[in-house]
């Protein structure tokens, strides 16, 4: 039997937990008894795969099996929670370009007050398989932060208050470790 487990090496066969020893983009061979009926599935904290029953009738044959884990509701909820906390923390930075954050604003004039950020709307979160890796992807989406700062014109010295929403676009890759730890990495255009 040749078992492919893209994006998560864990699966169950006939109720027994197994962890594939190969890269998630490869299939791992397993020796099984024939004839037999083998039920494959996956259930972890953040992922679930529908059961797949595979009959093996010919000794010595190679039967391909693909266990396709999908994000469950808890996965989306946890990623949304972690990213919201990240955005809120970014908004506490009193600079125009918050460090390691997806939003920021530049001015060609002089900034004369401390920038004040607030989150208006988080980007919507959907989680799909990353076509370029064995991880998960939050596709590019737009959120909005709000910035208030006083700006002085370099041309005539007039002072105005910039008090507007600042849209930002971001994507994320997500790796789910075998201990269910999430590693979320920002992707920018």
Which ranges hold each PLM region?
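Short loop/turn and low-complexity linker motifs enriched in small/turn-promoting residues
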Residues: 1-189
């Amino acid at each position: 039997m040749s078992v492919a487990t893209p994006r998560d090496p864990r699966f169950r066969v006939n109720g027994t937990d197994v962890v594939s020893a190969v890269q998630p983009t490869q299939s791992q061979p397993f020796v099984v008894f024939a004839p037999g009926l083998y039920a494959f599935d996956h259930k972890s904290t953040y992922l679930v795969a529908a059961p797949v029953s595979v009959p093996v009738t010919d000794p010595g044959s190679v039967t391909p099996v693909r266990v396709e884990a999908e994000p469950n509701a808890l996965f989306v909820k946890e990623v949304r929670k972690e990213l919201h906390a990240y955005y809120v923390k970014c908004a506490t930075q009193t600079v125009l370009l918050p460090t390691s954050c997806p939003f920021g604003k530049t001015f060609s004039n002089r900034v004369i007050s401390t920038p004040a950020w607030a989150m208006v709307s988080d980007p919507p979160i959907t989680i799909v398989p990353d076509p370029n890796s064995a991880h998960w992807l939050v596709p590019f989406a737009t959120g909005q932060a709000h910035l208030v700062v006083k700006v002085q014109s370099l041309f005539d010295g007039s002072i105005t208050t910039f008090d507007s929403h600042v849209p930002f676009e971001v994507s994320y890759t997500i790796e789910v470790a075998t201990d269910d730890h999430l590693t979320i990495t920002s992707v920018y255009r």
